[in-house]
Swiss-Prot record:
One of its GO terms (cellular component) is cytosol. Disulfide bonds: none annotated. InterPro entries: Pantoate_ligase (IPR003721), Pantoate_ligase_C (IPR042176), Rossmann-like_a/b/a_fold (IPR014729). This is Pantothenate synthetase. It holds the Pfam family Pantoate_ligase. It comes from Campylobacter hominis (strain ATCC BAA-381 / DSM 21671 / CCUG 45161 / LMG 19568 / NCTC 13146 / CH001A). The reaction proceeds by a bi uni uni bi ping pong mechanism. The active site is at residue 34.
Length: 273
């Protein structure tokens, strides 16, 4: 496995590759969710590249950039064990300049939900991914459904910038108890992990209601809020697969999303129906 730390090294590696390339962009602190993305990438491509870059432009002032979990040695070992072809681990000063052009996510997709709480976050996501896609030139990119809004915005960029890339949505990976895997779960103690389970349990309740033919989002939201107590709920949202707000559940074209705080840790989860 090649360990690449500069854009020049990545360019050189990519220039020598003629096979189909798959790419898994991450911020490191790799867990079983990331591993599932990498395994699918390896199954569907001849060359697999993984990036582990904690991108500063997608963090707001006061967020956890400095505290964000990092374990470079473990990330490298995981990728080696999975027989990844190259891991890209750049530094921020290698990746950004002061006077570079900016990319803005469309407000219709980025000013709501995560973007309402974290204004500018998705601009930073697109900024880094545009660079990474240009460097890695992948045929396939793999991203988790857990970040459903991000997935939609990235697909919008790929489509509108005429990038010849397939953005593949991968299923959410959960602990045995249902907790969605996240690098930020490391912030939670055992008591907080029990509270965090309220997110997935509220979504399971929503699914059970839909399975019983309930489509009224007000009924579903009320049931979810009851389960989420006493957490501070940021939002519960109901959208279609294009991230347009919906007034009732349409099975096969609906996503229910939830964001809530467990103490100071903000967690997100969703279910695709």
């Amino acid at each position: 496995m090649e360990i690449l730390r500069t854009t020049d090294e990545l360019r050189k590696f990519r220039a020598a590759v003629s096979q189909k390339v798959g790419f898994v962009p991450t911020m490191g602190a790799l867990h079983a969710g990331h591993i599932s993305l990498i395994k699918r990438c390896k199954d569907e491509n001849e060359i697999t590249i993984v990036s582990t870059f904690v991108n500063p432009t997608q963090f707001l002032a006061g967020e956890d950039l400095d505290k964000y979990p990092k374990n470079e040695a473990a990330d490298i070992k995981i990728c080696e064990n999975l027989e990844v072809d190259a891991i890209f681990i750049p530094k921020a000063d290698e990746f950004y300049e002061d006077d570079e052009p900016k990319i803005s996510a469309p407000k219709s997709l980025s000013a709501i939900l995560e973007g309402a709480t974290r204004p500018g976050h998705f601009d930073g996501v697109l900024q880094v991914l545009n660079k990474l896609f240009n460097l890695t030139k992948p045929k396939n990119v793999y991203m988790g459904k857990k970040d459903a809004q991000q997935l939609t915005i990235v697909r919008n960029m790929v489509q509108n910038f005429f990038m010849d890339i397939n953005v593949n949505a991968c299923e959410i990976v959960r602990e045995n108890d249902g907790l969605a895997l996240s690098s930020r779960n490391i912030y939670l103690d055992e008591e907080q992990k029990m509270l965090a389970l309220k997110l997935s349990r509220s979504l399971l309740k929503a699914k059970n209601l839909v399975d019983a033919s309930e489509t009224d989002i007000n009924v579903i939201k009320t049931a979810m809020l009851k389960i989420l107590e006493p957490l501070k709920v940021d939002y519960i949202a109901f959208v279609d697969r294009n991230f347009k707000e919906i007034s009732k559940i349409e099975v096969g074209n609906s996503i229910i999303l939830v964001a809530a705080y467990v103490d100071k840790t903000r967690l997100i989860d969703n279910i695709w129906l």
